């Protein structure tokens, strides 16, 4: 964690001290962020050892501070909003309990390269060119959004928040095959909803986003997205009309279609499917199952 001045460190310390009260008084006791526990109060030592990692909690707290420019009141309000949204929306369930349409699962890919460049190790791929061929998948916005949030949560589980080179994720949106002239209204609605959720409830997690196989006249893709994100996020965007040039940015991505160094595996073979929740995330999910039964 890097603080540019004493004031930033003071804001961080103030927030860390206030988190237990914020969780108790403003979030109905809900204490989980991306599968991790922020507050050790009320736990036995055994539970602390199993479910609470102070280093991770500190770095998540720092991310919140950084996301909102160390403005204390803004940080607190957004933390409240994020935790309450997670309590109500249940993104862990999206990732690990719910069964999504198989066709959706085939166009959302996770890859992980331990030897990749800093913060380009965990990559979420969205193959929109394949998705738009099945417009019926976008007709139920809620189902699509829950699938997409589940993919995001699985991607986050591949990060190491204590590591300086793997505490952000990278995304690739592949638009090969998408019409350059029009976009179905259902697809637009789903995209708009997902973008809004990511911008509001997943701050300071994106390292870079690559839009690939985007025709020159395909300006609405970028125009749609940039309307709903801040300037800091927009600076992380890279638009490539030629998908085979992606390898210049993600060196170990598949050679097939993307020009990376991996000539043995295509994207399907690189896909990481065996993803598990954190210990604390698993505890929350098991608790929910018990409550549902009762």
From Swiss-Prot:
Residues 100-266 form the CRAL-TRIO domain. GO terms for biological process: Golgi to plasma membrane protein transport; phosphatidylinositol metabolic process; phospholipid transport; regulation of establishment of cell polarity; regulation of exocytosis. Its cofactor is heme b. It comes from the Eukaryota. Keywords: Cytoplasm, Endoplasmic reticulum, Heme, Iron, Lipid transport, Membrane, Metal-binding, Microsome, Transport. It is a peripheral membrane protein. Heme binds at residues 128, 148, 173, 175, 209. PROSITE patterns: CRAL_TRIO. It is found in: Cytoplasm; Endoplasmic reticulum membrane; Microsome membrane. Transmembrane segments: none annotated. It catalyses: a 1,2-diacyl-sn-glycero-3-phospho-(1D-myo-inositol)(in) = a 1,2-diacyl-sn-glycero-3-phospho-(1D-myo-inositol)(out). One of its GO terms (molecular function) is phosphatidylinositol transfer activity. One of its GO terms (cellular component) is cytoplasm. InterPro entries: CRAL-TRIO_dom, CRAL-TRIO_dom_sf, Sfh5. Non-classical phosphatidylinositol (PtdIns) transfer protein (PITP), which exhibits PtdIns-binding/transfer activity in the absence of detectable PtdCho-binding/transfer activity. Regulates PtdIns(4,5)P2 homeostasis at the plasma membrane. Heme-binding protein that may play a role in organic oxidant-induced stress responses. Belongs to the SFH5 family. This is Phosphatidylinositol transfer protein SFH5. The gene is SFH5.
């Amino acid at each position: 964690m890097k603080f540019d001045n004493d004031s930033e460190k003071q804001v961080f310390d103030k927030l860390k001290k206030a988190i237990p009260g914020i969780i108790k008084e403003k979030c109905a006791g809900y204490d989980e962020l991306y599968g991790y526990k922020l507050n050790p109060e009320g736990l036995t030592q055994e539970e602390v050892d199993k479910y609470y990692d102070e280093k991770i909690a500190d770095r998540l707290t720092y991310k919140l501070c950084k996301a909102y420019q160390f403005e204390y009141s803004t940080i607190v309000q957004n933390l409240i909003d994020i935790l309450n949204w997670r309590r109500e929306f249940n993104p862990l369930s999206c990732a690990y309990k719910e069964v999504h349409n198989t066709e959706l699962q085939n166009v959302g890919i996770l890859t992980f390269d331990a030897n990749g460049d800093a913060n380009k190790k965990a990559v979420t791929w969205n193959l929109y060119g394949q998705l738009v061929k099945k417009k019926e998948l976008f007709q139920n916005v809620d189902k699509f959004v829950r699938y997409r949030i589940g993919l995001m949560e699985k991607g986050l589980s591949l990060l190491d928040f204590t590591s300086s080179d793997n505490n952000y994720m990278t995304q690739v949106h592949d638009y090969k095959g998408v019409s350059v002239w029009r976009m179905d209204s259902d697809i637009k609605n789903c995209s708009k909803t997902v973008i809004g959720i990511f911008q509001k409830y997943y701050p300071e997690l994106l390292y870079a986003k690559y839009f690939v196989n985007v025709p020159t006249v395909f300006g609405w893709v970028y125009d749609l997205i940039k309307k709903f994100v801040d300037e800091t996020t927009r600076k992380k965007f890279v638009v490539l009309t030629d998908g085979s040039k992606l390898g210049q940015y993600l060196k170990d991505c598949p050679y097939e279609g993307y020009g990376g160094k991996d000539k043995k595996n295509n994207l399907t073979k690189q896909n990481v499917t065996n993803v598990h929740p954190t210990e604390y995330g698993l505890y929350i999910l098991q608790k929910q199952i018990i409550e549902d039964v009762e």
